[in-house]
Amino acid sequence: FRFFTFSINKCTKDLNFKEPFKKLYTQGMVCHETYKDESGSWLSPDEIEKLNDKEAINIKSKKPVKIGAAEAMSKSKRNTIDPEKMIDKFGADSVRLFILSDSPPDRDILWSEQGIEGAYKFLQRIWNLNILILNRSETKRDKEIEKEFNRKINNYVNKVSVLIQTFSLNVAVANIYEVYNLFNSTLSKRISNDCFKKNLVKYMKILLPITPFLAHECLEKLK
């Protein structure tokens, strides 16, 4: 979009501005390991099989592969990854959560299937938390415990909202993990199901920009 704005401005000079946006946020690069065969030719991740963190072999020739440093993904070094494969395997929410949680958006990110799998497992725990609360037996409530629980949840909601607005997305995700731990450690306390559900709705709403599919499904069940 910036390119077309510059072109129109240069060719026609009909625009009253040069930049289409008030602020440009430069994002980091997506990086991945590089691989070479014995002849020094680049290999793609689909052409190798990793034996461990330091060893890999060429799937066709079964010969050792040299594992290089993680570099920005490029066609020339053949270290690109098709995100569709990870989306098909773990879901779009898992891939999105991994990307946002790995590092600040202005720094490079190291693409990792293990990292995406970790995000997938965390989302499974959030889903299970919803099921637990929906099926939880009613308990005697303690107003003071509920008040403190509400206060903590509200603090997290406000904090995460500010972090998202300031593009501190990895820190926002870290706080989202903390909110899960707070729910998990409070399930056995004397808090009413109604209180849990109301706060769970707040939790799902701060998850919406990060994992929209899961958050929408959970919100539907909480209606």
Q: Residue spans of the language-model regions?
A:
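Helix-rich, typically C-terminal accessory recognition domains appended to large enzymatic cores
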Residues: 3-4, 8-20, 85-223
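Conserved beta-strand -> loop -> alpha-helix junction used to position metal-binding or nucleic-acid-contacting
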Residues: 21-30, 64
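Extended, compositionally biased low-complexity polar/Lys-Gly-rich tracts
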Residues: 24-26, 69-78, 154, 158-163
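Short, conserved secondary-structure transition motifs
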Residues: 26-36, 208
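Conserved phosphate-binding loops in nucleotide/dinucleotide-binding enzymes
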Residues: 34-92, 106-117
